[in-house]
Amino acid sequence: YADRILLYGPPGTGKTYAAATNKVGYTLEGEPNVYQITMTEDTASANLEGFYKPNSSGSFEWHDGIAIQAWRRGGRLVVNEIDHASPDAMTFLHAILDDKDIAQLTLNNDNKETVRPAKGFTVIATTNSLPESLPMALKDRFPVKINVDKIHPKALDMFPKSWHGVINDTSLSDDIETRISIRAWRE
């Protein structure tokens, strides 16, 4: 099965919605097993890997970052706007996105714990850019790339049926001046 998928396409087509809500991301008990983060130039690798945080006794405890939580639990990591990741975060993402048969990381915690992805771990990343515009080292880590050029039907269902035509027309408009993302319709 595909364990690393890149969803790309215009803003507002429901890429993140599709990545985060598909039932494949649920445990057998029906609990969500989806971990989501949006990349920015300010996102540090610690957000993905983990960090020390003071506890109630005044000492510091290690807290796994979102990517390591997903790794340990065999969850789905949704990386929104992956092309906006800081160089620090991108370096960490390269390791997370290695083939699961060879992937392993040594954490920066006190005992330098080595972790590997649990069975079921997947990554779905989103971008508004074409895959060809991504750095080769990133692009090559996604064996599956899907163009999402239409609004996700379930995302559209959040609105009254009478609005669907107008939302489709404005969200998918070729005119950048009149395009409105589906996210803007919810606000």
Task: Give residue spans per PLM region.
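AAA+ P-loop NTPase catalytic core and its hallmark functional loops
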Residues: 1-162
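Conserved AAA+ ATPase small/helical "lid" subdomain
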Residues: 156-187
